[in-house]
């Protein structure tokens, strides 16, 4: 199995991946632990999942149907208008919000992969977050349903095979381990 960069940052299903990433200038506030946890400041929670895609089933959909699954235009990556976007679209259901309704973000570094000899195609979801609770809320929305009870339609074509949570400490944190 080999991961690779696909065209202009597209997932193997043909859509640009990571379009919801925060701008680089503010990415650290979403991806790195802050003052709320001083022992781990500057580290990050990295959650990695391997998804396989049923490419035959996916390709059986028209571009218009695929766009409704994702919630974006396939070729120009423009988000669909709210009135044409289903409530089960990936970019609707996979969002997380705080108690005041503000959207919470993570940094995604997803990687498409393929193993053609086994007819296996998919995406390694790699998400970095300040708090794992943000990523967890996104996953719960996708798999269990959001507050409105909508599940992520993308999961009709994608199956999570694995999932692992890591804490990625800073170099200073690791250097300090030998001091104790």
Please give the residue ranges for each predicted region.
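Long, histidine/aromatic-enriched segments associated with O2/redox biology
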Residues: 1-180
């Amino acid at each position: 199995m080999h991961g690779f960069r696909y065209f202009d940052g597209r997932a193997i299903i043909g859509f640009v991946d990571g379009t919801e990433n925060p701008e680089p200038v503010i990415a650290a506030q979403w991806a790195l632990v802050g003052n709320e946890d001083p022992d781990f400041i500057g580290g990050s929670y990295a959650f990695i999942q391997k998804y396989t895609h049923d490419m035959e089933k996916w390709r059986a959909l028209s571009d218009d149907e695929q766009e409704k699954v994702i919630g974006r235009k396939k070729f120009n990556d423009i988000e669909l208008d709210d009135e044409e976007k289903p409530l089960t679209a990936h970019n609707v259901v996979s969002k997380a919000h705080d108690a005041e309704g503000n959207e919470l973000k993570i940094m995604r570094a997803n990687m498409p992969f393929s193993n053609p000899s086994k007819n296996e195609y998919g995406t390694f979801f790699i998400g970095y977050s300040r708090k794992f609770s943000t990523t967890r809320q996104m996953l719960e929305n996708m798999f269990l349903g959001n507050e409105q009870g909508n599940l992520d339609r993308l999961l009709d074509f994608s199956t999570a095979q694995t999932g692992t949570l890591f804490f990625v400490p800073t170099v200073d944190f690791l250097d300090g381990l030998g001091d104790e």
